[in-house]
Regions:
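A conserved hydrophobic position in a structured secondary element of the catalytic/binding core
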Residues: 50-51, 105, 175, 223
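Conserved core of the sugar-phosphate nucleotidyltransferase
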Residues: 105-191
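Short, high-confidence coil segments that cap the C-terminus of an alpha-helix
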Residues: 43, 91-92, 119-122, 207
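N-terminal glycine-rich phosphate-binding loop and ensuing alpha1 helix
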Residues: 2-50
């Protein structure tokens, strides 16, 4: 498999749960725990991308691979692009964008996602099964696949007339740098703004993701203070 890189975009002023990336998880902040897990993957390098100087300073306490990005970026994908551009990535370089809300992110899943990008040359992401509670939880992003493993929609709310079966989206994206350049050339999509789902900019412009089932249970996503409390309670 070709070399690949992991970039973790992070910010403190998240609309849904401010400061979650520095939540204390048994002596480590969340972004530190996620970074250490990503380092166990086969990635050539793992980088953190943030527009916040205080968060950058915190991260420099456990890694040198921190890039302070522009405050003008509208989402994590744009921050990932800046890192890749500044590091002179070439079009075929594979980038794995790992969201900073999965404290138990698996390096095996990261390697698998990178292998699928290498194999297909497509936009790729992962999914897992939904629980009944997650089906109606708008903090849980869902996706619907067709029979060719192509994702035909992402959503927060489920709707009755959807063809296909709902899956839980795992917050991890894989693509070649060429797709990141394309992303930056596209206008923001309406659903990107209304749903706060950055991948919809690709989707609404007919660049579709392939979805693959995660090899390892990706664990919970921390999307709310309640999620954090539950995670700590179950892991004490």
């Amino acid at each position: 498999m070709s070399n690949f890189y992991v970039v973790i975009p992070a910010r403190l002023n998240s609309k849904r749960f401010p400061n979650k990336v520095i939540a204390n998880l048994f002596g480590e902040i969340m972004i530190q725990k996620i970074y250490k897990a990503c380092e166990k993957s086969k990635a050539k390098k793992v980088y953190i991308a943030t527009d916040d100087k205080s968060l950058s300073d915190l991260c420099l306490g456990f890694t040198k691979n921190v890039m302070l990005t522009s405050s003008e970026h509208r989402n994590g994908t744009e921050r990932v692009f800046e890192v890749a551009k500044n590091l002179n990535f070439v079009d075929d370089d594979i980038v794995i964008n790992v969201q900073c809300d999965m404290p138990d992110v698996s390096p095996i899943n990261i390697d698998f996602l990178a292998s699928m990008v290498c194999k297909t040359g497509s936009l790729c992401t992962l999914y897992t099964e939904l629980s009944k509670e997650q089906l109606t939880d708008e903090n849980t992003v869902k996706l619907v696949l067709n029979n060719d493993s192509q994702i035909i929609d992402f959503m927060r709310k489920t709707y009755k007339n959807s063809s296909g079966k709902f899956k839980k989206h795992v917050g991890m994206y894989g693509y070649n740098f060429s797709f990141l350049k394309k992303y930056m050339s596209l206008n923001q999509a309406n659903s990107e703004l209304t749903l706060s789902l950055e991948q919809m900019r690709f989707h609404e412009n007919d660049y579709f993701f392939n979805g693959y089932e995660a090899i390892i249970d990706p664990g919970v996503s921390i999307d709310s203070p309640e999620d954090l409390d539950n995670y700590i309670h179950h892991n004490e």
